[in-house]
């Protein structure tokens, strides 16, 4: 799957949760919060979607060899998508897959949720909860690696029809 914009996040969510939630892949229509933190208001989703599409467009123009800028822009995308929290549930899993696919398009791997590394997940949670771009950028910078084109072509997310 090629990430074209925020709509791709909705496709990913639908694919991941279609057997769990009837509303999988659909934007939430209710206001939500977690631990007292209010997420983005649904009344302004359209503006936020356009903004995230703009950030993704900027990301696509970054040269593959600019790892610093690559990590910074992915952190910015992650921070904004997390604050947006467009789904009632499953936001974290969908956004991690979304970022993984963005990285893969640049020929890089990114696994923000490795099963054997609890500290990565804890730093991810701290960065997203506190909207800490420095922590998110450093984490992404540490986790991205180059992959061969063969791997990138054969390890794509393929949504069900």
Task: For every predicted segment, state its role.
Residues 1-161:
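FIC/Doc superfamily catalytic core
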